[in-house]
Regions:
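Positively charged, low-complexity intrinsically disordered leader regions
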Residues: 1-50
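Glycine-rich phosphate/dinucleotide-binding loop and adjoining beta-alpha-beta core of small-molecule
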Residues: 1-5, 46-132
């Protein structure tokens, strides 16, 4: 696997963009569109089920994941969000994206100690929206 940029550089680029007038929600939508496009490319022209679960932190990485599954839901995918983290620490962007997830009636599950790995059984694509 080749890495174009690492997480540290990505954060610097984001910070520079925001400091120079680019709203963070615009950056988030762009990231979500790219993620959704990758998922569509993976499922295009094959027999993969279009079932996607996004594992989301309560920060802006998680907000990117929520936005991505919202876009995929609009394109006919079966989507679910699994939220990991304390909602009291959620960023404003995350809360805004979560509101949109509820509007689109996308199921949301909050991580609990008794969640088992079988939560992933019905999903063939997992979006990592925890790590940057």
């Amino acid at each position: 696997m080749k890495t174009a940029i690492d997480g540290k550089l990505a954060r610097r680029i984001d910070r520079y963009s925001i400091e120079n007038g680019m709203p963070s929600m615009v950056l988030m939508e762009r990231a979500a569109l790219c993620t959704a496009e990758c998922v569509k490319n993976i499922t295009k022209n094959n027999d993969l089920r279009k079932n996607v679960i996004a594992v989301c932190s309560v920060g802006n990485n998680g907000a990117d994941g929520l936005a991505a599954i919202r876009i995929l839901k609009a394109d006919g995918y079966n989507c679910k969000a699994l939220i990991i983290g304390n909602m009291e620490l959620a960023t404003e962007e995350f809360k805004a994206q979560l509101g949109l997830i509820h509007f689109w009636e996308i199921p949301v599950k909050h991580w609990e100690e008794d969640i088992h790995a079988d939560i992933f059984d019905e999903y063939n694509i997992i979006v990592d929206a925890v790590f940057g």
